[in-house]
Amino acid sequence: MPDFSYRPTIGRTYVYDNKSNKNLGSVIKNAKRKKHLLEHEAEEKFLDPLDHYMVAEDPFLGPGKNQKLTLFKEIRNVKPDTMKLIANWSGKEFLRETWTRFVEDSFPIVNDQEVMEVFLVINLRPTRPNRCYKFLAQHALRWDDNYVPHEVIRIVEPSYVGMNNEYRISLAKRGGGCPIMNIHSEYTNSFEQFVNRVIWENFYKPIVYIGTDSGEEEEILIEVSLVFKVKEFAPDAPLFTGPAY
């Protein structure tokens, strides 16, 4: 007969059925995962009506090659509660020197390239260390040719300059600015009217004011440049010659 008496020296074996038991951690994780999926589905359904709308991408980061032409770098003092004009397009001698360098050296334009858009890019830097303020900017794209802009204006509804203290303005006219082709021949044939007839006829000529939200007079390093978005076409002839091409 079997001996059912209790003896501490004899161990006992228990067999557990794990079919009805689950790990507590996995139960909590699965519950959170299901909750997250339900919230995600509800959020997507809420945003479904937005599929009928289109959002324009930043053309500055779009396809094409950006060619930068630095117009000038200079230091200017800006007094509190005021904004100063930083770009004056009436200097013919200044434009002559700039555009000569632009076409001949730093910006080689050929006939198989197309200028799709022009950006005015303004970089601002404080010259004095340990200064804590933000840059302000205000611009207008269209103005009468006979209008003489003021050198200094009061701050009225400005916008803060964004990341990296860079203020970028698209000069393309509404409806897609007219692309410029054969720009080198236009420059060669009529230089005196090149800027006014070619560039400003197809793109806006802006006026820009810069200021700060500081309560003191600040010294600012300003770099103004034009960035041309160039579209390149496939060449007619292969780039390489040889038995493999």
Swiss-Prot record:
Q: Name one GO cellular component term.
A: viral occlusion body
Calcium listed as a keyword: no
Q: What GO molecular function annotation could you give as one example from this UniProt entry? A: structural molecule activity
Keywords attached to this entry? Viral occlusion body
Q: What does the function comment of this entry state?
A: Major component of the virus occlusion bodies, which are large proteinaceous structures (polyhedra), that protect the virus from the outside environment for extended periods until they are ingested by insect larvae.
The text of the family note is: Belongs to the polyhedrin family.
Protein known as: Polyhedrin
* Native organism taxonomy: Viruses, Viruses incertae sedis, Naldaviricetes, Lefavirales, Baculoviridae
